[in-house]
Amino acid sequence: MALAAPLHELAEQAAALGTRIAIETMPFSAISTVPMGAEIVTAAAHPAAGLLVDAWHVFRAGTSLDQLRTALRPEMIFGVELDDAAPEVIGTLFEDTVDRRLFCGEGVFDLIGLVQVLRDLGFDGPWGVEILSTSYRVLPVDQALKQAADTALTVL
């Protein structure tokens, strides 16, 4: 587990400064799934090392809710980002993640199931909405914020 030692070292530094380090997995990166990230966090063996769980990254990596349930412990989840997407990747995975995300409930991700799994595990940390989308970038900020909050509440 080559990344565990550097993560442990970063977590030590973060803890000394009163903060923590979270890995966010990406299906097109060296740490491509949440279960893979959980293995690295477990091997790093430091309470200041954890994961940021992003719905887009979970579902586009093909990770099942059962795999999440098996891989995660509540103390390793530092935050969750909610978002949705179309049934098929639009463009490359990178283009899909930075330009084509949808508000919660507007796509095909099982966000209610994801939220339930994380709650069943005991996660009680912060929930956020991460909508990276060319179509939403043109919205007035107050409208985008309201739509993000309103749609997120439908799955929380």
Question: Where are the regions a protein language model picked out?
Answer:
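Gly/Pro-rich active-site loop or hairpin
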Residues: 34-38, 42, 57-124, 133, ...
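Soluble or luminal CAZymes and related metallo-dependent hydrolases
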Residues: 2-6, 32, 106-110, 144-147
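Hydrophobic faces of well-ordered beta-strands that scaffold small-molecule active sites
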Residues: 21-23, 49-53, 78-82, 125-129
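C-terminal helical cap(s) of enzyme catalytic domains, especially alpha/beta-barrels
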Residues: 138-156
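A general structural signal for short secondary-structure boundary/capping elements
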Residues: 101, 126-130, 149-153
